A protein has these predicted regions:
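N-terminal membrane-targeting hydrophobic helices
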Residues: 1-219
Length: 219
């Protein structure tokens, strides 16, 4: 899943209004933010195999540190604890941790059985939604659209940066996702990894746009 993860970050603002959207994006995408580092270091591996699923051409050979269930729980606890140590807000810390773990849950839905339960384990799981174009698109659009609606219902723009900066972010994510659907397989693993590294820039973009928005209070 891709934009569905960002939908989780948008929606989380409703239950953690004090938390920056940038932090929520970092949490919801943290496993994918780690993954390209491990690819470049040769610790985790992926194979480009067009046709392995109808949607994604990637054969995730092994990625136990970034994407096994056990490590997803560990990363969730680490980020939640770090947030609490910095902000002393227990509820928001739990939301940050839950956003991290939500990434594995959504990946479990779309991936073929390639997600390990723990590093070194032989069992691999995944429901394989990527084997259906229509189901994948429906799930992505629903998660992203619902998250976007929730975020817009609980925040309001304070200025043009908060209005257009946020919509530019949403458009970048949506059309970037569409481009990956129709662009075909990436030219190589290194290019794929550097493209993943570039996605780190989305977190500060989210922080900046969110800093120009205010919590919308019902009257």
């Amino acid at each position: 899943m891709f934009i569905g993860h960002f939908g989780v970050a948008f929606a989380a603002k409703k239950v953690a209004p004090e938390t920056s959207l940038g932090t929520l994006i970092l949490a919801a995408q943290f496993l994918d933010f780690l993954w390209p580092f491990f690819l470049l270091l040769g610790i985790e591996h992926v194979r480009i195999a067009p046709g392995i699923t109808r949607v994604s051409p990637l054969d995730f050979t092994d990625y136990p540190i970034s994407h096994s269930l056990l490590m997803a729980i560990v990363w969730a606890l680490v980020l939640g604890a770090m947030y609490y140590a910095l902000r002393r807000n227990m509820r928001s810390a739990w939301v940050v941790g839950a956003a991290v773990l939500s990434h594995w849950v959504l990946d479990f839905i779309v991936h073929r059985p390639d997600l390990q339960l723990y590093p070194g384990g032989s069992a691999r799981v995944g429901l394989g939604l990527w084997n259906s174009w229509m189901a994948t698109i429906a799930a992505e659009v629903f998660c992203f659209g619902a998250g976007l609606w929730i975020y817009l219902s609980c925040t309001r723009a304070r200025d043009n940066a908060g209005r257009y900066g946020f919509w530019a972010l949403a458009a970048f994510l949506f059309f970037g996702w569409l481009s990956t659907l129709f662009a075909g397989a990436p030219p190589g693993v290194t290019a794929l990894a550097w493209g993943g590294m570039a996605m780190w820039l989305v977190a500060p973009w989210g922080w900046w746009a969110d800093s120009h928005r205010a919590i919308a209070h019902s009257t």
